[in-house]
Regions:
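Cys-nucleophile CN-hydrolase/nitrilase-fold catalytic domain and related Cys-dependent amidase chemistry
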Residues: 20-100, 174-185, 190-193
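Extreme N-terminal starter segment of soluble prokaryotic enzymes
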Residues: 1-5
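Active-site catalytic loop in hydrolytic enzyme cores
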Residues: 85-161, 174-182, 245-255
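CN hydrolase (nitrilase-like) catalytic-core segments centered on the catalytic cysteine
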Residues: 59-78, 150-233
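Structural motif
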Residues: 33, 139-141, 165
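Short polar catalytic/cofactor-binding loops
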Residues: 7-13
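Short beta->alpha transition motifs characteristic of CBS
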Residues: 42, 95, 107-113, 215, ...
Length: 256
């Protein structure tokens, strides 16, 4: 299965340019699954501790109106997250989008940081805590949105449920890239699945500090590829049967 990860600009004008280039890359590579960064269709707002309802509603609207952008990735299956209003709550929701079926909710972010640059618990609430895999073409995918990935029991449970891919849309800073790659490698080892992540990237003088670097990690923790400023898109053809076989090897077969 051909999968694509990326790093996309937080700046609106640069994002538009990046999106056109991503669409061209996906078309050329004939990608089947594209993982997007966290809440990518609006500039990162949680850099500010003070919640702004006007900005929140603008972000929600931008994501609701993103279907034309997603169509540029078709026929690939696009995976990402959106800010949403649901049942009186503000949430960060993972989704799977395909031209044939449209937007499908997949998971609500559960673990929310609340610190400098990432005041997420001040901007929205945690979801229900439902970590249920979703189908994306021939792959079974388990979402862990950014901070969710550090709670590895969920990746292990995803592995027990047979997922081929752990999908981690991110918005993370420059000084933590190595740490997040460690998280991806650990998630792949405990699940026996490929781990994919895409991140946003900001300008040096932007208020938001977002460091880019998407990655694809194999089912045993081997880093298969990284994105960079020079190569912001990475597409690999994954043999999903390797994830299926990995479930029967150490440490996945060990019962808790």
């Amino acid at each position: 299965m051909k999968v694509t990860v990326c790093e996309l600009s937080n700046h609106p004008e640069e994002f538009a340019r990046d999106w056109d280039r991503l669409a061209a890359h996906v078309n050329e590579e004939q990608s089947e699954l594209v993982l997007l960064p966290e809440m990518v269709f609006f500039p990162w707002s949680a850099w500010s501790k003070k919640f702004d309802p006007v900005i929140w509603e603008a972000a929600v609207k931008a994501h609701e109106q993103a279907e034309d952008l997603l169509r540029k990735l078709s026929p690939a299956c696009a995976c990402g997250t959106s800010p949403i209003n649901k049942d009186g709550k503000r949430l960060n929701e993972a989704f799977v989008w395909e031209k044939s079926s449209g937007y499908r909710p997949a998971h609500e972010k559960y673990y929310l940081p609340d610190e400098e640059g990432f005041w997420e618990a001040s901007w929205y609430e945690r979801g229900k805590g439902d970590f249920t895999p979703v189908k994306c073409r021939q792959a079974l995918v388990g979402f862990v949105i950014c901070t969710d990935i550090w709670f590895f029991d969920h990746s292990r449970t995803y592995g027990k449920k047979g997922v081929h891919i752990i999908a981690c849309p991110r918005a993370t800073p420059r000084n933590s890239l190595e740490k997040w790659l460690v998280a991806g490698r650990a998630a792949s080892v405990v699940s026996g699945a490929f781990a994919l992540s895409s991140n946003r990237i900001s300008r040096e003088r932007e208020k938001a500090d977002l460091g880019g670097q998407g990655w694809i990690v194999g089912p045993n923790g081997k880093v298969l590829g990284l994105t960079s400023a020079k190569k912001p898109f990475l597409t690999l053809d994954l043999d999903l049967s390797k994830a299926e076989r990995a479930k029967h090897t150490y440490p996945r077969y060990v019962e808790a």
